[in-house]
Amino acid sequence: YLPQGLLPVEILDLPGPLFDRLGADPGPLRRTAPADPSADQSLVSVILPVFNGAEVLGTALRGLRAQSWQNLEILVVDDGSSDDSLALARAAARQDARIRVLAQGRNLGAYPARNAGFSAAQGAFITVHDADDWSHPQKIELQVRPLIEEPELQATVSHWLRVGNDLQMARWRMEERWVYRNVSSLMLRAGLRDGLGYWDRVRVNADTEYYYRIL
């Protein structure tokens, strides 16, 4: 992160494995922001689909709630979980008014869950965050600022690194690299939803298809 000019990552004094304790202090960034975070920040909707993700959901939400870009709508879409995911999401929503919970009632799959969040999203920009991911506090800001500053730009993505609970890096494929384009983090202008439609209701890789649909 440091070579990219980002805040350094630290291990927080929290229980659990190292991955669940990742953090970075966005305080220096927030102290330069106005008292009303929506005053100069467009609303970004973050769709967070979850299915039986009670063990990981808290880490994902903690990362989103700590974003330097504070004007967020966090849409947790529970896809018919049989564990405590829905209860945990509702508890988080009681603590943070930016969190909204949508309950599917039964398991429909990852992309129907994303589509439910897509339909409900009210932000000027919309993105997705997987339930088992952690995001650096500057992630949302670094994706949305180019969209605001360059009106002709339609979408942005981030990059990801796969690690285990002990933060040991692991390769996703048999390739000589560690960092990959994160098409599931696609952030787009809300207007594209009307022009391009929703994710295909398939089991895998609909996010990649949507990425190329924009191209």
Model-assigned labels for residue ranges:
Residues 134-172:
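Conserved donor NDP-sugar-binding/catalytic core segment of glycosyltransferases
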Residues 78-87, 106, 130:
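A conserved acidic beta->alpha catalytic loop
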Residues 62-71:
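Short, acidic, metal-binding catalytic loop of nucleotide-sugar glycosyltransferases
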Residues 103-121, 142:
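Glycine-rich, basic loop-to-helix element that forms the pyrophosphate-binding segment
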Residues 174-215:
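Conserved nucleotide-sugar donor-binding catalytic segment
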Residues 126:
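Short aromatic/hydrophobic "clamp" motif used to bind/position activated sugar donors
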Residues 42-47, 73, 209:
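Cell-envelope/extracellular polymer assembly enzymes that use nucleotide-activated donors
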Residues 1-41:
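Non-catalytic membrane-proximal stalk/linker segments that position and tether the catalytic domains
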